[in-house]
């Protein structure tokens, strides 16, 4: 690939229009780096260009220690009056242990929402957006988070459509559940490129369209919200995998597609440093470590209707140590010693 073409791509994707007085980076450049963090896996070709530019410009100091970013997937459907946080994941850039982690927080976790009372975790976003959600997470789990990246599901459908679909392995039950909701999702999806409505033909590895993938992310009736969280992580990983296989010439259009549906409070230089750090960690060969909370093992949590909160997950308050040790000490959640100490279980509420 000749240098002139490379420089043109970098200029178009990363610099855009630069303010003469402030010299700050364009929204498009910020969206590129945000996309990288959202997808976690940091596509090699894109990062190759970005890494080259980072090493030729001056950025802030190296990010040290552990950085937690709250990744929010908001689902404000057309027939609903307000947005709710349908997907909550903590993206951890761990420079202490050289690892990247993706931890799902179940939206139905029973928590004490400051100023509101007991309810579901995702209700804190409904009542006070990201700031109240930050407070709730800090009070309940002892994890202080100040940075967030928010993506709405409608926009995520556009990204998957632009990618030509994503490959996801699904079970027969999942396929049947998705096909039940596909017609309504398709009908409400306002995109001229969505094509004719199609159902998923079978189980196994299937290439899902945008509306099929989001229907897949939403299903929960066949199992529980915990499995739903796992499905959401699978789709994110599938998007990342597909993104890596796309030609560099398509990045510009993909970024334009994603841009309207992304919101973040992270500054551009900070995003650059995070992206560079994440890339360096993943270059060492470690894969993304995944976790989820509450711990669903019929011992450290209990699911069901509770008081006036509806269907919730009550969790063992002492099991928060498993979550914190995974994020801060890099201790595998499934092999944490606390899980054997059943005499200390104390359900909240």
Q: What is the role of each PLM region?
A:
Residues 76-79, 119-127, 142-147, 218-227, ...:
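Second-shell loop/turn segments in exported
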Residues 81, 161-253:
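Flexible, polar/acidic helix-loop-strand segments at domain edges
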Residues 27-99, 276-278:
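Entry/capping segment at the start of metal-dependent catalytic domains
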Residues 81-84, 115, 124-132, 150-154, ...:
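Soluble non-cytosolic domains of exported or imported proteins
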């Amino acid at each position: 690939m000749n240098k002139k073409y490379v420089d043109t791509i970098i200029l178009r994707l990363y610099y855009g229009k630069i303010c003469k007085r402030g010299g700050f980076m364009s929204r498009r450049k910020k969206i590129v780096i945000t996309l990288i963090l959202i997808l976690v896996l940091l596509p090699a070709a894109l990062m190759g260009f970005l890494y080259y530019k980072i090493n030729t410009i001056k950025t802030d100091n190296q990010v040290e220690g552990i950085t937690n970013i709250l990744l929010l997937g908001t689902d404000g459907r057309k027939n609903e009056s307000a947005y709710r946080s349908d997907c909550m994941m903590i993206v951890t850039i761990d420079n202490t242990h050289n690892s990247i982690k993706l931890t799902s927080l179940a939206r139905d976790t029973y928590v004490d929402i400051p100023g509101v009372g007991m309810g579901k975790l995702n209700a804190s976003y409904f009542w006070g957006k990201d700031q109240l959600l930050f407070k709730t997470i800090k009070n309940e789990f002892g994890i202080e988070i100040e940075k967030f990246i928010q993506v709405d599901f409608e926009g995520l459908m556009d990204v998957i459509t632009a990618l030509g679909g994503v490959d996801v392995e699904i079970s027969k039950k999942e396929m049947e559940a998705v096909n039940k909701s596909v017609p309504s999702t398709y009908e409400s999806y306002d995109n001229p490129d969505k094509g004719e409505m199609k159902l998923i033909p079978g189980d196994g590895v299937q290439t899902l369209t945008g509306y099929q993938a989001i229907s897949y992310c939403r299903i929960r009736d066949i199992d529980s919200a915990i499995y739903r969280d796992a499905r959401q992580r699978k789709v994110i990983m599938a998007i990342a995998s597909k993104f890596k296989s796309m030609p560099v010439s398509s990045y510009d259009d993909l970024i334009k597609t994603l841009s309207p549906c992304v919101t973040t409070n992270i500054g551009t230089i900070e995003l650059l440093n995070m992206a560079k750090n994440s890339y360096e960690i993943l270059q060492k060969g470690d894969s993304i470590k995944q976790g989820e909370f509450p711990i669903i093992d019929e011992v450290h949590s209990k699911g069901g209707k509770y008081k006036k909160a509806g269907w919730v997950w009550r969790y063992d308050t002492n099991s928060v140590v498993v979550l914190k040790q995974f994020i801060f000490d890099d201790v595998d959640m499934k092999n944490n010693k606390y899980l054997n100490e059943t005499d200390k279980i104390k359900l909240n509420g």
